[in-house]
Amino acid sequence: MNNYLEKVNKIDSNSALKFGILFSLIFTGLIFLANTYWFSEPELLPKPEGVAFWYKWQLNDPTWLTRASVWLLYLGHQGSIWWLIYKAQEEKPTYSEGLHWFNIAALLANAFFITMHLFQTGIWYDGLAQDVLEVSAQWSVIVLLFMVLIMENQRRGMFLGKKIGFVSNAAVSIRKYHGYYFAWATIYTFWYHPMVGTQGHLMGFLYMFLLLLQGSLFFTRMHLNPKWTIFLEATVVVHAMLVALAAGHNWPMFLFGFLGVFVVTQMYGLPISQKMRWLIWVAFTGVFIGVYSYKGWDTWHEIFFVSGTLWACAILFSGLILLIQPKNTISEEG
């Protein structure tokens, strides 16, 4: 057993990350091919009258078997990853360059359930969307994003590199338990959707694969790598814009909303010079002026809807955490 653990620990987490990214790209391609040559779209549930936002990829006539197929696989996926997080925290390992046994187990579990989801879509189609609200899947990821803002406040600040003290204090409890929530948010959202081959779905599944990969590398140095983690945060820009374009929604609001979070908050966690930051600001401002000069300046303030929601939620949630967080938690962390 000790020899096995030593061999596992020699597997570099950086190499595991690269292999995981390659797997994610290849599997996204498999979803496209499956939708092109295998899947046939069933009769979908029509949009009810008076519903503003509607997720149309739901069976019009679901059965107990179609529902059971997705719920059993979802619960198996969720339970296995939560169990691995629990066992890992029980061991209290140090962050290492190599993989731990539970990293290997998490990577294999995620790869298995990703593959099962493809077959489940091809045979039974439905995701969790049949039984839960669309807003639950959306907000599960939104909460994940602003929780990252809270946890990273101590390292990169919240606004232009400036830290908010009480947010850093609130991050202590979040940092300890965030793995359970992040695992739920990603796995729940992953099983919400059938593996459909639209642009938005393909980008969304690629993003979910990368988040599952990040979650599998807990207690390794790559899990904390700022370039990788900020890449994950910023990737949501592309996904949100593609979904907005496909749905005919207001794509500039999502593009500049999420880019605004990047230039105001996230890029201050990157090891780049002040000159490079100014260049990024100039590029952001130039594109913003160009788009809204064409679109019209009467709605320019909409860019604060997305970024403002994330910042406000991060600050308000931090205040709520401090109200319920035991007073000795901060001193214990220190």
Q: Model features per residue range: what roles?
A:
Residues 82-179, 191-196:
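Membrane-interface helix-loop-helix junctions at boundaries between adjacent transmembrane segments
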Residues 215-296:
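Intrinsically disordered, low-complexity segments enriched in Gly and acidic/Ser/Thr residues
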Residues 2-119:
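An N-terminal, globular interaction/scaffold subdomain
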Residues 100-105, 159-185, 203, 220-235, ...:
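Cytoplasm-facing juxtamembrane segments at the starts of transmembrane helices
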Residues 32-51, 115-126, 154-161, 251-252, ...:
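Membrane-helix interface motif
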Residues 69-82, 138-156, 206-214, 255-267, ...:
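Hydrophobic cores of alpha-helical transmembrane segments in multi-pass inner/ER membrane proteins
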Residues 59-65, 159-171, 187-196, 211-222, ...:
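Short juxtamembrane and helix-loop transition motifs at transmembrane-helix boundaries
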Residues 2-6, 80-98, 152-172, 216-229, ...:
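Cytoplasmic membrane-interface regions of multi-pass membrane proteins
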